[in-house]
Design a protein with these regions (language model features):
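Flexible, Lys/Arg-rich cytosolic regulatory linkers and terminal tails that connect or flank
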Residues: 1-49, 162
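Conserved Rossmann-fold NAD(P)-dependent oxidoreductase catalytic core, especially the SDR/UDP-sugar
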Residues: 12-13, 123, 129, 133-192, ...
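Strand-loop microenvironment adjacent to phosphate/nucleotide-handling motifs in alpha/beta enzyme folds
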Residues: 35, 40-42, 193, 197-214, ...
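N-terminal Rossmann NAD(P)H-binding glycine-rich loop of SDR-like oxidoreductase domains
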Residues: 50-70
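Short beta-strand element of Class I
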Residues: 73-76
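Helix N-cap at the beta1-alpha1 junction of Rossmann-like dinucleotide-binding domains, i.e.
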Residues: 79-84
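Hydrophobic/aromatic anchor residues within beta-strands of the central parallel beta-sheet
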Residues: 104, 146, 206-209
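Conserved Rossmann-fold cofactor-binding substructure of NAD(P)-dependent oxidoreductases
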Residues: 105-126
């Protein structure tokens, strides 16, 4: 779909060529452009070798694009999927010149020997860790795979990075790590725990950046809704009251780079995601962008919450809200550190690994033992499919929702 850049042209006859522009996910978020301290970002990227895991993905590729603006000595694009990574490398060479120092490396974070080989060969100074299994319902069906990749892949990467003298490690986290109801979010919470553990016990500066949904990324709602509209509908949403925090891909990547420059090791940085967006409103607006009218000539169908899904996400725990601290950037806050019993944590990790390697449903119980705030919204059926355990028919208490959202917004304002 294309938008008319100047609505006044509607009354002046046929718009001229160039009067239209492509739909941008930012059209759905009414807020100012992110302001960056580029000197701070340059200070740790310029002239350095930078490794981006998951570099061919939506966020990883945008990180690579923006890192190139700061003239790194070398950019390493690490991904298990060769096609997207190769296309990104070609894009960067077309933009910056065929002789730029960009290397595409194929491998898995689950393969520690491959990681050691990469670190020994290229000696990166900075690591951005964007590789992960992120699809919430799919990870409910394959919880052991989520654990192997997200938890132990991250542990492999942290271990190899620390052993090979990496200066700075930036982990991409998610609001789904807060009071998780799904396996993916729970694994990301454990990754935050790993970050703080390595920050405390190694010389490497480690930090995580927690943010919400990214508009336009693989599997996000706008591409899904667009495809459904092009196919004649229906447009499907899981619950009429479901809300989410959103950022555009460039916004998220810019703030990740900025948070990486703050360099307070062990920090969990929380991004100000602005006001939450009701998914029903998003679907309605997009349907109208395409010239249809919701539930007149384009049906909106409510399908019920998917396994692991919840009605609204939170950017911080209740225990974090009163202790959030501000940073030099007005859109980045710091969550208070977790108290982690190192011996108990590593014992729980061993138990989790055992369950994951046996593809045991017991992995979900192990996750619950490790993350006390994890309350799974899943039930395994007799045919081995997984369904949401609750929430499909309930109506959200709008007063409670608004109270929760107001408290989060107030906390961010107070921190400023």
């Amino acid at each position: 779909v294309q938008l008319l850049s100047d609505p006044q042209l509607v009354g002046s006859g046929a718009p001229q060529q160039g009067a239209f522009r492509e739909l941008n996910p930012a059209d759905f978020l009414s807020r100012d452009e992110v302001t960056l301290d580029t000197d701070q970002i340059s200070s740790y990227l310029t002239g350095k070798t930078v490794l981006v895991t998951g570099g061919g993905g939506s966020i990883g590729s945008e990180l690579c694009r923006q890192i190139m603006r700061y003239r790194p000595r070398q950019l390493l694009i690490f991904d298990i999927y060769e096609n997207c990574a190769y296309e990104l490398e070609m894009e960067l060479r077309n933009k910056y010149g065929a002789d730029i120092n960009v290397v595409t490396l194929i491998g898995s974070i689950r393969d520690i020997k491959r990681l050691d080989e990469v670190f020994e060969t290229y000696h990166p100074s900075v690591v951005f860790h964007a590789a992960a299994h992120k699809h919430v319902p799919l990870m409910e069906v394959s919880p052991a795979e989520a654990v192997k990749n997200n938890v132990f892949g991250t542990k492999n990467l942290l271990t190899s990075a620390a052993e090979h003298g990496v200066e700075r490690f930036v982990q991409l986290s998610t609001d789904k790590a807060v009071n998780p109801t799904n396996v993916m979010g729970c694994t990301k919470r454990i990754c935050e725990m790993l970050i703080q553990t390595f920050a405390k016990n190694t010389s490497m500066k480690c930090m995580a950046v927690r943010f919400g949904n990214v508009l336009g990324s693989h599997g996000s709602v706008i591409p899904l809704f667009e495809e459904q509209i092009k196919n004649g509908g229906p447009v499907t949403i899981t619950h009429p009251d479901i809300v989410r925090y959103f950022m555009t891909i460039p916004e998220a990547a810019q703030l990740v780079l900025q948070a990486g420059g703050l360099a307070q090791s062990g920090s969990i940085y929380v991004l100000d995601m602005g006001e939450p967006v009701k998914i029903m409103d998003l679907a309605t607006r997009l349907i109208r962008f395409y010239g249809y009218e919701p539930n007149v000539n384009m049906e909106i169908k409510v399908t019920g919450l998917r396994p692991g899904e919840k009605l609204y996400e939170e950017l911080m725990l209740d225990s974090e809200q009163d202790r959030m601290t501000k940073t030099a950037h007005d859109k980045i806050f710091i969550a208070p550190p977790m108290q982690i019993d190192l011996a108990a944590f590593y014992e729980e990790l061993q138990n989790l690994r055992h369950d994951a390697e046996h593809n045991d449903e017991g992995v979900v119980l192990s996750l619950q033992r490790m993350v006390g705030t994890y309350h799974p919204n899943r039930v395994v059926n007799e045919d081995h499919t997984v369904s949401a355990a609750h929430g499909n028919t309930e109506t959200i208490d709008k007063e409670e929702l608004q109270k929760a959202l107001d408290e989060q917004h107030s906390t961010q304002q107070n921190a400023q």
